């Protein structure tokens, strides 16, 4: 047996829940009222579906119970206080089943509500019109039969994916089923080809079910627009049998033009047109061909159909038959003098005209007779035929040519007696004769020579010139004529008749003549270049101004030729003062040579040779007339004197005397203007020792920074510096830079002690000596006797003592010495302190040490000081770091108790006879 259905399981679950609640209620409150319950109270069931209903009560022992409904039952299950029943094939839109129980002589009831729903399985969009005019309304109608409930239904009309209208049916009665939605829509161009559809939505989500959707099949809308105007026909009004003429039909304002159908016919003949679309217009073209069966009045029809509507145009076309006239000659070719008959005939309705003369009546032929002459050869005869068709006059014509046979004729127009051709270009030589048949023409020289190639393209040469006999012949006879051929050509100037170069001699008679070749004979004119209108004619007395270039031009009708003729006039040598001066000055180093240019043609050769004195037989170098890479070497020295210059060419010679002098530009060097000069301060100053060589004698000026050197002054240190000296004469300048140094005697500018206060025993002090001198001075010191452990700086400018003792007190002298003198200054150093008694107590020991120091000092003075240097370490260990004078120095023991270093007596010049030795310290 199959298990219970899901609905039954839900009903049983509800029943057990109700029983449990009932038992709990009985145990908790025995006085609670009894009730009946129906589950589910409200249910939505798809139409035709089934449902389990559970009916239960809390009555402990109900007497009886049941479920009242009009729906079909399929099965029932019972318990003490419950009843479950399955309802099937539920189709009613809405039913209310009743659950009841009898308990304690009371009837307990519970009512339920069962509603059915039907999916929108059928969604129908009513058919659209086959064609819908643009700008007019059409109806969209959508039906959804049976779907419901209607209150949960929504219908939407769509154009493609675009919603046009959407409607819901909320508020409709619960039992209402099915729906219809209708809308009026304006047809537009863009709706053509659009798909319209309807979408139905049954929304049961508020009732715990889903959303059911369905759409109709799409329906395509076709819109159209057709102009109210009739088509335009373009066709001939008349159409000849057997002819083809184009016809066309045009209509604007069509949409869609591609859907239009065009019918084009002539009578009952369909023309099957070719249709061309141009936007909202079309052009239908076809070719109409008329046949004899269609002769008469016919209609040309153009019919346009679109969207079930049509537009039509009709026009009348007359089809006619009009053959061309017939023109005949009795003889198409006759001999001169024979009679010829010309006849023109046409159809029965046509009127013919022959050579402008009409026939008497339509349908009758026209005739003409003539006696054939030469002038009638190739004569054309014209026949016209006219026919009236539908009020219009039609014309056709025909022509025929008559040939007349006659003997040849050579006319001057076709074969001139005199021919003149230009030489060179290719020509077609023509001598034509009239005659029928066409005559043959032959031209040859009378002497049996050259033959002219008539009718052929060929070059024209001078050899063709001459007289020719031309003969024309055909089967009717012959003709003879003599012709003369002249070949013309442009002038030519050759070297024989007109040489390129002509030489004349000054003072003789000559003429300038040029002979040119050409046909016709050319005229020759010679004009000097650059002189308009100066034509050279006849004999000339040759002068130099006749030399130059002449333009000779030969001219005839065939052209011109021109040639330049260079005329040279030669003459003997002649000196001119500007080009060969009588006096010349040579400047040494200028690189110039004597220029002696001589006038003459051809160019004379020139040689200058010394005459007398030191220049006897000496050849004077000359500058070449034209610069050349192989110019003569320029001499470094040129002997001045008198030279004789001779100029010679083939027309003579001439001599001239030249006086040559020599000069030179300024020159300064180390010997005449030393680059370094030294002055002594205070001396009388004179000009700088600068001189220059040169001719004429140069002047020399010296300046510093543009300021000239004063004539007289005393030399001071400010005069030291750099001077610029310039030497000048007529041939140039030379300059040198001179450095002036000013030397002066030494002066001890500063002698100072540090510290400036008192020096206590055991303390340190330093003496500084600064001297001004040039060249730099040598510094020397003189210290008190017995002063030990004295240190000097490398240049002796500083004297220092570490651990001063009483022996360091006394007078110190600083002396500065250079080549120009000596200068000295003195300073007194005092050493004192509270331990003076110690010094007194050790006086005896000091005396002994002093004696030993004096001996050592004498040794140092006699050895190291006289050499000018000694070792610093040795000097310090010996206790003597200074050089003493010959007397052994001054006393150094008298230092005051409160004293300190001080200058004693300021600067004092050392006696000339005193000897002070300089001390140079060197590293050990």
Swiss-Prot record:
Single GO MF descriptor: integrin binding
Keywords from the named record: Cell adhesion, Disulfide bond, Glycoprotein, Immunoglobulin domain, Membrane, Phosphoprotein, Repeat, Signal, Transmembrane, Transmembrane helix
Gly residues bias: start-end ranges: 891-903
Record annotation: effect of changing residue 140 to V: In a breast cancer sample; somatic mutation
Disulfide bonds: 55-99, 59-103, 142-198, 249-302, 344-383, 415-470, 498-552, 580-645, 673-725, 769-814
One Pfam family this sequence matches: ICAM1_3_5_D2
UniProt name for this protein: Intercellular adhesion molecule 5
Natural source organism: Homo sapiens (Human)
